[in-house]
């Protein structure tokens, strides 16, 4: 074997090793990106859990207010004040009912968002590990 043959063989092996190293570096970069995305989705899921807790607390407060609104705690002598009180109480009940419905819708939306964030976190984590 002469020097040129050896040189050609070494250069060929170096190119193969360099190509393989570039492929590995690219794979590491891609998987690192997946891990970053998985971490971001996990953090989002965690934050959405707190938001859900806040909404559930608010929903309980609204439910308590609705229950309290149904109780007649004020008695006013005379027809006009009673009518005004009843109208305002009914308006308050209606607004509390609407608020409760909005809270339920928001709660459902947050729950879906939390589930999707959890699924995405798992998806990207699995991509990074496979």
UniProtKB/Swiss-Prot annotation:
Q: Which residues form a coiled coil?
A: none
Query: Where does it reside?
Result: Secreted
In its keyword annotation, does this UniProt entry include Secreted?
Answer: yes
Q: How does it assemble?
A: Forms both homodimers and heterodimers with EsxA. Homodimerization is calcium-dependent.
What's its job? Implements its pathogenic function during infection.
Q: Which family does it belong to?
A: Belongs to the EsxC family.
Q: Please report the name of this protein according to its UniProt entry.
A: Type VII secretion system extracellular protein C
Which species? Staphylococcus aureus (strain MW2)
